[in-house]
Amino acid sequence: KVGNLDSMRTWSDVRDAVRAYYLLVTSNPISGEYYNIGGTHTCTVRKMLEHLISISTCKDIKVEIDPERLRPIDADLQIPDTTKFTSHTGWKPEITFEQTMEDLLNYWREQVKSGRRYLNR
């Protein structure tokens, strides 16, 4: 069950985000300044899901739109401007979208294999 598949998102790996936060706190941040961090790969939620399904060993996946997962207001496109953060810290995303999706899928394969399931939906 999914929500809006047509929303565009800029995907980033949490490992890149953690590295960004670390760089920020260790780079003498300017008090009161704000910084945007984010990935560089932009695509629809549908394309992300199609990619996950394409690298999955399970091919009979049924995708169902769940009205309860649709947001009343949903930004069609979200792209962070990381210019200021990059110039201040030298940070840029290192982990590709494809690697992130593969690692995500492998993580959940291990969860299922070990009997640990954290999603109740």
Give, region by region, the residue ranges found by the protein language model.
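PAPS/PAP-binding and catalytic site of the sulfotransferase fold
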Residues: 44-56, 100-101
